[in-house]
């Protein structure tokens, strides 16, 4: 069975817990409001950037590894924590590369927004909001957690999310955070 989130169960279909499967379900359920552009080139960019944020070895994956590292390295690990770390593929090689990979992805995303801005556009791709904009708005909280009133997280878990290295903090281009805040204000 599926024991991770998010999970979407729809009709009699199997539960979905992969970002792209959930996205494709949303596309089928409401084809008039596409989150993936219909233009082929933009579609490829949308899926590629979405993977860079959500997918294996993407921003979320690498930030999670960085978040787990101090706990795994500690002698005072919560019960069952290593099972969760193992489930998510925690390994020393990927952990050592997590910051570097995160920085690269943040630079790609900032560059894309700057490119769009020079063309008078306010979204990652094209002239309208796409999955990339929503994914960035959500996953950006792994780099800079929004205040509790905007992003409720259990007070005992907030320190885990707020423990962000200076390397990552320094890569948070203002254009990324302004975009996150605008998307959150306008769409959430």
Predicted features and spans:
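Short His-centered aromatic/hydrophobic patch
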Residues: 139-188
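Short acidic (Asp/Glu) and glycine-rich catalytic loops that position anionic groups and cofactors
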Residues: 2-5, 117, 160
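GST-like fold's C-terminal all-alpha helical module
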Residues: 48, 55-156
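Residue-level detector of alpha-helix boundaries and kinks
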Residues: 7, 11, 31, 87, ...
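C-terminal alpha-helix
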Residues: 25, 29, 112, 182-186
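GST-like domain detector, emphasizing the conserved glutathione-binding G-site
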Residues: 1-81
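Generic alpha-helical structural signal
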Residues: 20-23, 47, 103-107, 177, ...
């Amino acid at each position: 069975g599926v024991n991770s989130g998010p999970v979407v169960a729809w009709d009699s279909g199997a539960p979905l817990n992969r970002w792209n499967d959930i996205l494709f379900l949303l596309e089928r359920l409401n084809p008039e409001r596409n989150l993936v552009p219909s233009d082929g080139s933009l579609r490829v960019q949308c899926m590629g950037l979405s993977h860079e944020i959500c997918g294996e070895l993407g921003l979320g994956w690498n930030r999670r590894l960085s978040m787990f590292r101090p706990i795994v390295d500690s002698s005072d690990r919560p019960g069952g924590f290593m099972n969760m770390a193992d489930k998510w593929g925690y390994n020393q090689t990927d952990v050592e590369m997590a910051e570097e990979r995160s920085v690269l992805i943040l630079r790609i995303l900032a560059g894309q927004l700057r490119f769009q801005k020079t063309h008078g556009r306010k979204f990652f791709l094209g002239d309208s909001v796409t999955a990339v904009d929503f994914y960035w708005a959500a996953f950006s909280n792994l780099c800079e957690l929004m205040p509790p009133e905007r992003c409720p997280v259990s007070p005992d878990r907030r320190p885990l999310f707020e423990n962000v290295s200076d390397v990552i903090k320094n890569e948070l281009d203002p254009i990324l955070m302004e975009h996150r805040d605008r998307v959150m204000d306008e769409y959430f």
